[in-house]
C-alpha cells in the first residue's frame, strides 16, 4: 500500500504509522487523516498486529490543522459533509493505539494524540489548543478529551489563553504517561507496544473497552461492564494458556483465541 503523507511499518507485532508532511510540520489535512485511517484499517485487519503506534518527527508530532485547507470552508459545507467525521474513526479503533509525541503537538495535533489510548512524549514536547487565536474552537475532541485528561481548570486555561503545556507539566497532570529524551522516545514507545502485542489481543481490547467505559457511564454500570468482560475471557484459549503458563513458570504463548 502506497501513501503520500504517512509511512507505515510493521514489526514484532506492532504497526507504526509515521506522519510524513515535514514541510508543513505534519499539519493535518483531509489527505493525511484519510491515509491514517487507511493504515489503521489495514493494521486492524492484520491478525499479526497486536498494538499500533502513531508518531511524527522529532520537531513536530503535528503542529495543527492545515489552515490553508480550512480557511475557505463554510458552515453549510462542513455541516452537511460532517467535516472531521473521518477523524472520529481514529478514536474508535479497537486495538491499543499509542501516540509518540516529540516537539509540537498543537491544535489538531494535540487532539490527534488525545484520541490515542495513551501518550508517551519527548522532553521537548509542547501541547496546546490555540484555536481561539484563529477565531474558532477545537473541533475533533479537544474540549472534551483534554478536560477528561487534565481537569476543567487547566483545560479552560489552555483553550482560552492558548498557553502551551510542556512535557513535565503534561506528565504531572496526567496528559501523558511517560517522558523520554527525543532520541529514546520512539524506541521506548515501540518497546511498550511490543510488550502489549505479546499479550492476548482479546484481553487487551477488553481492557481498553472497560477503561473507556469509565468515562461514559456511572461507577455501578462500569463495574457491571468490567465484570461481564472478566467472565468473557474465561471462554478463551488465551486465558487457559496464560494461567497454565503461570502455574508452570514459563512464558505464555498467546494465539488470540
Predicted regions mapped to residue ranges:
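Conserved CoA-thioester-binding segment of acyl-CoA-metabolizing enzymes
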Residues: 1-57, 88
Amino acid at each position: 500500500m502506497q501513501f503520500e503523507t504517512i509511512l507505515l511499518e510493521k514489526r514484532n507485532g506492532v504497526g507504526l504509522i509515521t506522519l510524513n508532511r515535514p514541510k508543513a510540520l505534519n499539519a493535518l489535512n483531509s489527505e493525511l487523516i484519510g491515509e491514517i485511517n487507511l493504515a489503521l484499517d489495514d493494521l486492524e485487519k492484520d491478525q499479526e498486529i497486536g498494538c499500533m503506534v502513531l508518531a511524527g518527527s522529532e520537531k513536530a508530532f503535528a503542529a495543527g490543522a492545515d489552515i490553508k485547507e480550512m480557511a475557505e470552508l463554510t458552515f453549510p459545507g462542513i455541516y452537511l459533509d460532517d467535516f472531521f467525521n473521518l477523524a472520529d474513526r481514529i478514536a474508535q479503533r479497537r486495538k491499543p493505539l499509542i501516540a509518540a509525541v516529540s516537539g509540537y503537538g498543537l491544535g489538531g495535533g494535540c487532539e490527534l494524540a488525545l484520541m490515542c489510548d495513551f501518550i508517551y512524549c519527548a522532553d521537548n514536547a509542547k501541547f496546546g489548543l490555540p484555536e481561539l487565536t484563529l477565531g474558532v474552537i477545537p473541533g475533533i475532541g479537544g474540549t472534551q478529551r483534554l478536560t477528561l485528561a487534565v481537569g476543567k481548570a487547566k483545560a479552560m486555561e489552555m483553550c482560552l489563553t492558548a498557553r502551551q503545556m510542556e512535557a513535565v507539566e503534561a506528565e504531572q497532570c496526567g496528559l501523558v504517561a511517560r517522558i523520554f529524551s527525543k532520541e529514546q522516545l520512539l524506541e521506548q514507545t515501540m518497546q511498550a507496544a511490543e510488550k502489549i502485542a505479546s499479550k492476548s489481543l482479546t484481553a487487551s481490547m477488553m481492557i481498553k473497552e472497560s477503561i473507556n467505559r469509565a468515562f461514559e457511564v456511572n461507577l455501578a454500570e462500569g463495574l457491571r461492564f468490567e465484570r461481564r468482560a472478566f467472565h468473557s475471557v474465561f471462554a478463551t484459549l488465551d486465558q487457559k494458556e496464560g494461567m497454565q503458563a503461570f502455574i508452570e513458570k514459563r512464558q505464555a504463548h498467546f494465539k488470540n483465541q
